[in-house]
From Swiss-Prot:
Residues binding Zn(2+): C17, C20, C36, C39
Protein name according to UniProt: Small ribosomal subunit protein eS27
UniProt keyword terms in alphabetical order: Metal-binding, Ribonucleoprotein, Ribosomal protein, Zinc, Zinc-finger
Highest rank taxon of the organism: Archaea
InterPro entries assigned: Ribosomal_eS27, Ribosomal_eS27_Zn-bd_dom_sf, Ribosomal_zn-bd
Name of the encoding gene: rps27e
One GO BP annotation of this record: translation
Residue ranges that the Swiss-Prot or TrEMBL entry lists as coiled coil: none
Cofactor details (free text): Binds 1 zinc ion per subunit.
Length: 62
């Protein structure tokens, strides 16, 4: 018997805001623009698949 499994390719990433150095966890395939909760600068822009992350990625969570 063949068992089909679907591997999850999306993940959460911890990023550092380039303007205020705030660390924030975001989804790497965000479908809405993600802004920093402290200063309001744009951290990620949706592209139809993976989001274009404009901040420094610190860690990725599986």
């Amino acid at each position: 018997m063949v068992q089909l499994t679907r591997e999850n390719r999306s993940k959460f990433v911890k990023v550092k805001c380039p303007d205020c150095e705030n660390e924030q966890t975001i989804f790497d395939r965000a479908c809405t623009p993600v802004d920093c909760i402290v200063c309001g600068s744009n951290l990620a822009t949706p592209t139809g698949g993976k989001a274009q992350i404009k901040a420094e990625i610190i860690t990725a969570f599986e």
